[in-house]
Amino acid sequence: MSSSMLAHKFLLDENVHKKLERFLRSKNYDVSTIPKGAKNGVLAAKSKTEKRIFVTNDSDFTTYSKESIFCVIWLRVPQFKPESLIVSFSKMLKNTDDKDLAGTLIILKEESFEISSLPTKQ
């Protein structure tokens, strides 16, 4: 495993399957979780200030500006398929371990992922 891969730090939303959290920790990633009920603005600010990739099932975060959140991974893999989620997440990590993900939105699907830029502040 490359050291650059471990440079990614994650902030997991309360709606993310615990098996993904355990997987990331088992790979020695820096993973932070948030208290249940934390406000979206607080989550975005924590992601930005700590340069953490925010992982969520919530589509609301896909419209946040790159000035207000560091990076968003929007999970589109069904929550009742945690094994598929881990396989998809692992493939995505292998393809992004050397990339600067600041200001990006990653849409993670069961068989693929898409990377695009988050919108800029209007």
Language-model-detected regions and their locations in the chain:
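Ligand-binding "clamshell"
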Residues: 66-74
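Charged phosphate-binding loop/patch that engages nucleotide di/tri-phosphates or the phosphate backbone
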Residues: 1-2, 8, 96-122
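N-terminal first-folded block
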Residues: 8-52
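Short, acidic/turn-prone active-site loops that include or flank metal/cofactor-
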Residues: 34-40, 60, 77-82
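Ser/Thr/Gly-rich flexible loops in soluble cytosolic domains mediating phosphotransfer, phosphorylation
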Residues: 73-111
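Short, charged, surface-exposed secondary-structure boundary motifs
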Residues: 40-45, 67, 81-90
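Acidic, metal-binding active-site segment of PIN/NYN-like and related structure-specific nucleases
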Residues: 47-65
